[in-house]
Curated annotation (Swiss-Prot):
The keyword Cytoplasm applies. It comes from Xenopus tropicalis. Residues 1-59 are annotated as: Disordered. GO terms for biological process: DNA repair; microtubule anchoring; microtubule cytoskeleton organization; mitotic spindle assembly; mitotic spindle organization. Its main location: nucleus. It is found in: Nucleus; Cytoplasm, Cytoskeleton, Microtubule organizing center, Centrosome, Centriole; Cytoplasm, Cytoskeleton, Spindle pole. Belongs to the BCP1 family. GO terms for cellular component: centriole; centrosome; cytoplasm; mitotic spindle pole; nucleus. During interphase, required for microtubule organizing and anchoring activities. During mitosis, required for the organization and stabilization of the spindle pole. May promote cell cycle arrest and DNA repair. Keywords: Cell cycle, Cytoplasm, Cytoskeleton, DNA damage, DNA repair, Nucleus. Residues 19-54 have a biased composition (Acidic residues). This is Protein BCCIP homolog. Residues 8-18 have a biased composition (Basic and acidic residues). Pfam families: BCCIP (PF13862).
Length: 310
């Protein structure tokens, strides 16, 4: 599956070149030197903010994607006790579903990379059926993480609901993973989700692992202004206060049956909003857990499509 989405990238900073005439002027006139510095800074700023269009394509997840997927999973789970390596291996083993986002290759790139066993992964999408994989170490750790954070941040009634859903074998829960680097645009997520839904339908029809899911469990990277949170529980955060690292997660949030947020401030190295384009307002990093009925997926995709068309 190919995507027409484009990525905004920042070019490396570099000093502007000066010709001999400029150098002579700098040696002879201090005021000219000041003007040149200002001009250079302006040129550098223009270079840094220059947009570079890169074509992305989605590929079947393979062994060469292992390190890239691990890196993205570490951004999601941070210091949580989840076996990232085992989870990555699981995603690679069940590669009849899911895709890795990579830069589209030209023939020249392909020839140059013949000896390179590692692909650069900009994002990926996949799903782990928590019910089918019950007993697998990383799956049990994910369930324990959700329930523990729920106990710490929510009322007991919410904990009981999550516990019931995660341990109900008659209504399988799929852990939906859609991760990408922050500078990869949201436009690429729509075809990725649509392709995954097709793959899940094929999987169900052919009785392959993953099968039908009654619910989707989503762990989303979110943020809130530090001034708007207390030192106590985070729990049920108002939607208008949450900022989503992945724009499409907002539409999952709107349709979620159960949801709560918890702080990861002590686990995260990023505490300033500037890195996330939130105007340098001090931000508190959160993780937002959402349980979404599978039959609401079409509605979510419609909302996402509408959002991208504006």
């Amino acid at each position: 599956m190919a995507s027409n989405a484009k990525r905004r990238a920042l070019e490396p900073e570099r000093l502007p070149e000066r010709n001999e005439e400029e150098e002579d002027d700098m040696e002879g006139d201090n005021s000219d030197e000041s003007d040149d510095i200002e001009d250079d800074e302006s040129e550098e700023e223009e270079e840094v903010n220059e947009e570079v269009n890169i074509d992305f394509e989605a590929y079947t997840i393979s062994d060469t994607d292992s390190e890239g997927i691990k890196k993205l999973l570490k951004q999601l789970f941070l210091k949580a006790h989840v076996n990232i390596s085992e989870l990555t291996d699981l995603l690679i083993q069940q590669n009849h579903i899911g895709s890795a986002i990579k830069q589209a290759e030209s023939q020249e790139d392909s020839d140059d990379d013949d000896d390179d066993d590692v692909d650069h992964v900009f994002g990926f999408i996949s799903l782990v059926n928590l019910t089918e994989r019950k007993g697998t170490s990383c799956v049990e750790q994910i369930k324990e993480l959700i329930l523990t954070r729920c106990e710490e941040n929510c009322e007991q009634s919410m904990v009981e609901q999550f516990d019931k859903v995660l341990n109900n074998n008659s209504k399988p829960v799929g852990f939906l993973l859609s991760e990408r680097f922050i500078n990869v645009p949201a436009q690429i997520a729509l075809p990725m989700h649509q392709q995954l839904q097709k793959e899940l339908a094929d999987t169900q029809r052919t009785n392959k692992p993953c099968g039908k899911c009654y619910y989707y469990l989503i762990l989303s990277k979110t943020f809130v202004e530090a001034a708007k949170t207390s030192k106590g529980r985070v729990g049920s955060q108002a939607k208008e206060e949450l900022m989503f690292a992945n724009a499409e997660d907002e539409f999952f949030y709107e349709k979620a049956l159960l949801k709560f947020s918890y702080s990861v401030q002590e686990e995260s190295d990023t505490q300033l909003g500037g890195r996330w384009s939130f105007s340098d307002v001090p931000m508190k990093p959160l993780r937002t857990v959402m349980l979404v009925p599978a039959d609401r997926m079409n509605s979510i995709m419609d909302k996402f499509k509408e959002y991208l068309s504006v």
